[in-house]
Swiss-Prot record:
Positions of the record's site feature: Transition state stabilizer: 155
Secretion signal, residue range per the UniProt entry: none
Gene: mtnA
Keyword Acetylation included in the entry's annotation: no
Protein's name according to its UniProt entry: Methylthioribose-1-phosphate isomerase
Any single biological process term in GO: L-methionine salvage from methylthioadenosine
Keyword entries, A-Z: Amino-acid biosynthesis, Isomerase, Methionine biosynthesis
HAMAP family xrefs: Salvage_MtnA
Family, as annotated: Belongs to the eIF-2B alpha/beta/delta subunits family. MtnA subfamily.
EC id: 5.3.1.23
Keyword Isomerase attributed: yes
Pathway noted in the entry: Amino-acid biosynthesis; L-methionine biosynthesis via salvage pathway; L-methionine from S-methyl-5-thio-alpha-D-ribose 1-phosphate: step 1/6
Length: 346
């Protein structure tokens, strides 16, 4: 199941808010539709929204009424700004848009139609490189898993969260393809239940054994020695190895540390933000209180109750055993080793 499809010169995004009940694609005829899809989590996961935004910029370029290069680029900068503001925490979003604009600014072509073609080629490259990166990550990461691996994961870092294959679930997939006996424990991941709705669905679709648990069962699961390792994705990793990921990840990492269970993070180099020295500098998105107070459109809490709804938390590097990338497994000290592996990233 592809979360992002470019077909017949049109972008289609799988509406993940409707999974697993309904498989429905959003037809993105303008860049505003792409921005809304990213904002409302119809497309989500750091690598996926980066690729979606790249294609969104292509859609925007189709809308731009300009005949000269200068006007064309100015209007695209404004569109990139709008798309980049939809979600502040995931660095892949801004990375993909910056890469698209850099490709345009360095292209010698003056003809607007030629520039549009260059943009589509670059968006395709971002998409295809992500799939390839995920497969490489999976290959490196599966080596960390024992032959019989019980893996706990949080949120959804699978094919749905990327251009394809997945980051954390890419590790699981690769292990499964190697013939390892993998059993996934999926945190439901409140408040939007990405683990229940998406991770469980992906695993069931592929025939990989999966057990769904509520978030507050994770500690007891670990205490019963039912978990061999934790593998999660990331929305941003800072230069020192601090990791921003879906809210609740930090708690899982603390529990893993207490129970001496390795906590691994799988993420492409595009998720690593070397401009930030630590997780304290990461902007944390706060979302609509109704995500907490309502479910399926029905209230679950008294009207008027105050709500705090950060979408992400930050796991300090001291709790991370290793970071799995497409260039290999990065071990502590992260500040030194991330700098080495990122020095040549595109």
């Amino acid at each position: 199941m592809n979360a992002i499809i470019w077909e017949n010169n049109q972008l289609q995004l799988l509406d993940q808010t409707k999974l697993p009940r309904t498989i429905e694609y959003i037809q993105c005829t303008d860049y505003h539709t792409v921005g809304k899809a990213i904002k409302k989590l119809s497309v989500r996961g750091a690598p996926a929204i980066g690729a979606a935004a790249a294609y969104g910029l292509v859609v925007g370029a189709q809308q731009v009424d300009a005949t000269d290069r200068k006007t064309f680029l100015e209007k695209l900068e404004a569109i990139a700004g709008e798309l980049g503001a939809t979600r502040p925490t995931a660095v892949n979003l801004r990375w993909a848009l910056d890469r698209m604009m850099m490709r345009l600014s360095t292209a010698p072509e003056q003809n607007v139609e030629d520039l549009r073609k260059i943009m589509l080629e670059e968006a395709h490259a971002i998409y295809n490189e992500d799939v390839e990166s995920n497969r490489k990550m999976g290959e490196y990461g599966q080596e960390l898993l024992p032959e019989e691996a019980r893996v706990l994961t949080h949120c959804n870092a699978g094919a749905l969260a990327t251009a394809g294959y997945g980051t954390a679930l890419g590790v699981v997939r690769a292990a499964h393809e190697k013939g390892k006996k993998v059993h996934v424990y999926a945190d439901e991941t409140r408040p939007l239940l990405q683990g229940a709705r998406l991770t469980s669905w992906e695993m069931v679709q592929e025939g990989i054994p999966v057990t769904l648990i509520t978030d507050n069962m994770a500690g007891y699961l670990m205490s019963k020695k039912m978990v061999d390792c934790i593998v999660v994705g990331a929305d941003r990793i800072t230069a020192n190895g601090d990791v921003a990921n879906k809210i609740g990840t930090y708690g899982v990492a603390v529990l893993a540390n207490h129970h001496n269970i390795p906590f691994y993070v799988a993420a492409p180099l595009s998720t690593i933000d070397m401009s930030l020295s630590s997780g304290e500098e990461i902007p944390i998105e706060e979302r609509d209180p109704q995500e907490v107070t309502h479910h399926g459109g029905q209230p679950m809490a008294p009207e008027g109750v105050q709500v705090w709804n950060p979408a992400f938390d930050v796991t300090p590097n001291s709790l991370v055993k290793a970071i799995i990338t497409e260039r290999g497994v990065v071990l502590p000290p992260f500040a030194e080793n991330l700098a080495k592996i990122c020095c040549n990233k595109k």
